Amino acid sequence: MADPAVDVQKEDFYQDMTCAPIFGHILNYSHMLKLQAVHHIAIICSDYPKSKQFYTEILGFNIDREVFRDARDSYKLDLSLNGQYIIELFSFPSPPARVSRPEACGLRHIAFQVDNVEEAIADLNAKDIYPEPVRIDEFTGKKFTFFADPDDLPIELYEI
């Protein structure tokens, strides 16, 4: 018996572009979630003091709240940028290393917009961080570069 929630004929799909095939089903976009924005990104680090220093002193995030959770033997650090809550930084005892290369499924990188990529690179170089050479986005023509956080999470700087 067909599932009425996904019972859309192929002909209907091509006539009504509010539908798209997802996970082997055809879903009606009129019933999709109405997400508003990314609320925050949670990052687990292997060396809490080093990552805290990186995200605050190198990248310029502000500390909104920091707590040690005894039951989890873990720190939780809430970080904001320009008044917007963005990152939860967690420490856990002996977390497994993140696989960055070869690229694996899951989070690929996080990207931050900057006014000037070359100025951002100069600031990072002054702090002994050396991003990849600047590239140009083939679609937008904008400049971008990558470097890594202390646990090799790729971070992109994208010029707006």
Task: Annotate each predicted stretch with a short phrase.
Residues M1-H31:
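N-terminal amphipathic/basic-hydrophobic helices that include classical n-h-c signal peptides
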Residues C19, I26-K34, V67, D78, ...:
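Vicinal oxygen chelate
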Residues I26-P49, L107-I110:
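N-terminal beta-strand motif that seeds the catalytic metal site of vicinal oxygen chelate
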Residues A37, D73-Y75, G106, G141:
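Exposed loop/turn and edge beta-strand positions of beta-sandwich/beta-sheet ligand-binding modules
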Residues I44-I86:
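Core segments of cupin and vicinal oxygen chelate
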Residues D64-E66, R72-S74, S94-S100, P133:
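A short, acidic/glycine-rich surface segment
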